[in-house]
């Protein structure tokens, strides 16, 4: 058998364009939906299609991350509108409508456009071929879960007879382990949630027939995902592109030449980069969004990229012991004028939005942070805003005064 051909990065194509760091930043902002008029007609589903993946997380401060992502781009979007856009429930007694999205492992646990189902065939195959899992399953548990879903229709883990014993993943029941494994294999899918609980169904019943296949080989899956990641990023290094859907660098290397992305150089990056050719056709212009960002937003979820593009060091501290936190439990980066200008660690107390800690790079950012807090307060039905701490007492007083003038 002939040895497989492996492409490496030792020989790189000539760059088709040279971008300044500022041009790359604006291309990235536009690609992520933060430059120009919001696509309100496309709405939440348009945001999902544009980004290709929206990360899920259980933390809920102002809102959950999958709600914060469309809010950051569109403004005040009703939570029911968000949930219905992602998870359209099937009417009782009728055939399920075509789902708009499904949940799967991408950058992390994510909501993905249903059209991307075929692209993850490579990952489903890898999971099926995996020899070891963290949990051993009792004999017959997996088959029983599939049999029950086939007979009874879409069910939560509780409906199946076994959710988590505790909140920790390592203490899942056998049924929960089985249904989650079936989801990773692609035999089961989640296209709906009820009260934040996943609703599981057979993929053959929930995924549209035209998409329900694993026909794409691994190379084609990777090529498409690299192309989509490049489009969603606008411009990125190999590591940026790989991180978007958690691919390996060698997987990106193997397909990037055939992905449709074009090689570019970006001043100051010091690494080869690739761009979406459509992103290079027009100069990024338009109005910038001023908003709070979820730490799980795809604009900032890659720490190395965020630091390179924005000069902003970002780290989620929710899992850091409280005495060691620098910026707060759920510090949200503040985007204003196309730059990250500070952080706000928010919470809610009744109808009061509390900025537990505000960290700003400059007093000049106070008006933008005040605007972001006022919009967020309106969105979550808070009528007052309180600033507990800032990185200097003067900043706290100035921000409080600015907010009081607008409330």
What are these regions, as identified by a protein language model?
Residues 2-407:
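Long, charged, low-complexity, helical-prone intrinsically disordered regions
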